[in-house]
Amino acid sequence: GPTLKKALDFLTGDRWTIGFRARPARFAAIAQTAPPTLITPPFDSLSLFSGGLDSLIGAIDLLEGGATPLLVSHFGEGATSDAQGKLFAGLKKHYSRSSFDRLRVGMTFGDGLVEGVGSENSTRGRSFLFFALGVFAGTGLGRHFTLRVPENGLIALNVPLDPLRLGSNSTRTTHPYYMARWNDLLAAVGIDGEVRNPYWDK
């Protein structure tokens, strides 16, 4: 609980109160057990793929190094989805001999989701979902994984680029403190993986 609160407080600038409760018995199993297969996933690496320049460079660096990454994408609106699709298609065309692929999930929350509570009009907390999706994909590999979150070091440090981009108006998605809390969280819940920004010093 405290680790999760620290991560979300820092990411969003809000102050979170988090509680846990037992899952009802009828939801004891929330996912079907995967059938056995003789074909193991071909992926040897895992990287978030937002459709931005840094995530594209991250994918290219892996592919140029001979890796077979699983790229993980999340989108909430059409423009982002289009950019991701075009870039992924370009990568597939250029690296046609590679078996790399993409896990892509779209998710938005409509108005009135919680009665009497206004909808969130920012995307400050969006990266928590993005990281969680990447970690979910990593656990499916059945071994220790490193989720790469490519972002240039200056942006990761949350330096205000103009007078308006201060505090909660600017992203903390890849700030070293936030990513360290994610690694604390993974250790606390027993997930054999880590998140890492390969360009933290670039």
Language-model segments: what does each one mean?
Residues 49:
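Phosphate-binding P-loop/Walker A region and its immediate neighborhood
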